[in-house]
Amino acid sequence: MSVFDDSWLDDRRALEGADPILRRLAEAGARIRRETADASDPISELPGLPRPRAVIAAGSEARFIRAILEPVCPVPFVAWPTHGLPGWVGALDLVVVMASDGARPGLIATVHEAVRRGSQLLIACPRISTIAEHAGSRSTIVLPTATADPLAAAIVMLDGLHELQLGPEVHPSTVADAMDQVAEDCSPFADVSVNPAKDLAMGLAEVQPLVWGGSVLAARASRRLAEALRAASGRAALAADADALLPILEAVAPSDPFADPFEDAVSADRRPCLVLLDDGNTDSLIRSDHTRLVAAAERNDIRVCTIEHWQGSDVERYATLLQTGMFAAVYLSVGLGRTLLS
């Protein structure tokens, strides 16, 4: 079992092994700006298009798009999880496809089906790619991508859907600024004492993370973070709603203040840690769940770690929570002496 060494979080040599993924995280804001600039011309063509009967989204970040659009979209919205399209989709509908990698076979089948049925197709993909070739039709608008960043492509797509009056206004530049701020705050050159991602990594060093996000977007970020923590540590990490996490928290015996940290290392390693992703949502049910989780953790001497960001739009808050968590996962990997692949 790997032992966490917090000195590695400020060790230049140890951090060099994670440089590629840290650099990619730090460049997230720049990727959003590039994708936005490249897609500006096709997005300017969107306001003149007729309102569709329904919107069907497919590809990476389709559920993220749904989380943003569902509360305000004036037409039915479906996030389609598999290849092809529902049988009812036709020429009156808009098919939205995120394919920043450009070549997933299932999405190619979806695009082919949309073109065959004469649906309006709005696709984010590389200009020169297999899927772009299949997307060619009079009813297709391509938002070109070049960075293979699913979130950057999704933010550009949200900008386009706003121009179609199907979603809320999104300011890609402010989302990019938020990403830049996270990169600065969580920089490998920032000391542990002022770096929220390194601080979280230290909090998660010897525990089993139980990750919770109350709002739809925070819950999505919690699932993404749990995936990253599993990859970083090789240990279990669970993201779930409050009703699923409470029985786990309540079943944990309070910690023994007289336990030997060396002799009892195995059992201590398995103690859970409650990780809260708080985007400032003031819904009474969400705040109630937050209170119940914290109270259960405190009763049983369970550590609570929080990532919070209350400023900006829904998309900015989501991006900030997620990106901070991604940096923390990398630092957890560094502290455990593991190689984390991007």
Predicted regions, residues:
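Phosphate-moiety recognition in structured ligand-binding domains
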Residues: 1-41, 119-127, 131-140, 145, ...
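Active-site phosphate/pyrophosphate-binding segments
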Residues: 12-24, 29-45, 146, 162-266
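Short, highly selective alpha-helical patches that border small-molecule cofactor pockets
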Residues: 25, 62-66, 107, 222, ...
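Glycine-rich phosphate-binding loops that contact phosphosugars or nucleotide phosphates
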Residues: 48-184, 279-280, 291-292
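Short hydrophobic beta-strand segments
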Residues: 53-59, 206-214, 273-278
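N-terminal beta-loop-helix "entrance" segment that forms/cooperates
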Residues: 66-69, 246-255, 314-315, 319-324
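Short helix-loop-beta junction
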Residues: 66-78, 227-238, 295-301
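A generic structural motif
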Residues: 77-84, 124-126, 235-247, 303-312
